[in-house]
C-alpha cells in the first residue's frame, strides 16, 4: 500500500522509518512524491453551457473571474428570478459547489477564482434536475477554454543560514532555482538568506546544503502557497492533457436537431 505524507527532511524520514519499525514491525521505504499543480485564470470571461438532447433542456451562463492568490474557489448567484426560477438557481449553485472543477492546461484542480451565475434558461416541460448539472459543468469548461489560464505550483518560504564563505554558492543556487530572496546579517560569520522558491526544485536542497557547507548550513522550509509555475511549458508537455478529449469534463454543449 501507499501513504502520502508532506515532504520531510532526510533525518525526519529516518526517524519516522524507525518509529514505524518499532511500533508496527514493518520495514518501509520512501520515494519522491509528485508535485500537485493547480490552475486559475487571469482574465474575466463568460462561459455558456447548453444541454438539450431529446426531451431535455437547460442553459447556464457563468461569469468566471480571477480571484486573489490563496482565496480558493467562490460561487455566487446574480441572476434575476424573471430569467431563471430561484429553485433552478439553487440547483446550479449546488452543482458548482459539489464538483472539483479541473483546468484545461493539465486537468489540475482549479483555485483562486469566482464563478457567478448570471443567466440561465429552463423548459417548462422538458427540464430535469440532471440537465442543469450537465449545463453547469459545460459552462465552466467552455469559459475556461476562452480564458487565459495560468498553471500554479506550490512554493516554499525558506530561510538558509550559512557561513559567509558559502553565500556566493547559495545565491547562485537560488538564482538557478528561480527563487526570489533577500540577504541579512546573522550572528558572527553567518548570513541568513530568506525568500520563496518552487517546491519542485528547492524541496531536496537540504542535501546540497549539507554537502557544500560540510553540515554547518541550516535550511528551514515552510509552505507559502501557490504561485505561477516557473516552467509552465515543460509541465504542460509532460502532462499531455487534451481538454477536448476529456469525456468526464466535456467542453462542448449538446443541442437537439430540430428542437425538443
Where do the language-model regions lie?
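Accessory interaction regions appended to the cores of large information-processing enzymes
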Residues: 1-260
Amino acid at each position: 500500500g501507499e501513504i502520502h505524507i508532506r515532504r520531510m527532511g532526510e533525518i525526519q524520514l529516518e526517524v519516522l522509518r524507525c518509529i514505524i519499525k518499532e511500533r508496527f514491525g514493518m520495514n518501509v521505504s520512501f520515494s519522491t512524491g509528485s508535485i500537485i499543480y493547480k490552475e486559475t485564470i487571469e482574465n474575466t470571461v463568460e462561459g455558456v453551457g447548453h444541454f438539450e438532447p431529446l426531451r431535455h433542456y437547460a442553459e447556464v451562463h457563468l461569469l468566471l473571474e480571477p480571484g486573489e492568490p490563496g482565496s480558493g474557489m467562490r460561487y455566487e448567484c446574480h441572476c434575476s428570478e424573471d430569467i431563471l426560477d430561484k429553485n433552478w438557481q439553487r440547483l446550479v449553485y449546488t452543482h458548482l459547489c459539489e464538483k472539483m472543477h479541473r483546468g484545461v492546461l493539465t486537468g489540475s484542480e482549479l483555485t483562486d477564482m469566482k464563478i457567478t451565475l448570471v443567466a440561465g434558461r429552463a423548459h417548462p416541460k422538458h427540464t430535469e434536475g440532471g440537465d442543469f448539472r450537465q449545463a453547469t459543468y459545460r459552462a465552466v469548461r467552455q469559459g475556461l477554454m476562452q480564458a487565459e489560464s495560468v498553471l500554479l505550483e506550490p512554493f516554499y518560504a525558506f530561510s538558509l543560514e550559512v557561513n559567509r564563505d558559502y553565500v556566493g554558492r547559495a545565491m547562485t543556487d537560488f538564482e538557478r532555482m528561480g527563487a526570489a530572496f533577500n540577504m541579512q546579517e546573522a550572528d558572527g560569520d553567518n548570513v541568513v538568506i530568506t525568500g520563496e522558491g518552487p517546491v519542485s526544485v528547492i524541496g531536496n536542497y537540504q542535501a546540497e546544503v549539507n554537502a557544500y557547507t560540510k553540515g554547518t548550513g541550516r535550511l528551514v522550509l515552510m509552505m507559502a502557497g501557490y504561485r505561477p509555475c516557473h516552467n509552465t511549458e515543460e509541465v504542460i508537455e509532460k502532462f499531455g492533457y487534451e481538454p477536448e478529449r476529456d469525456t468526464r469534463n466535456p467542453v462542448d454543449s449538446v443541442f437537439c436537431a430540430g428542437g425538443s
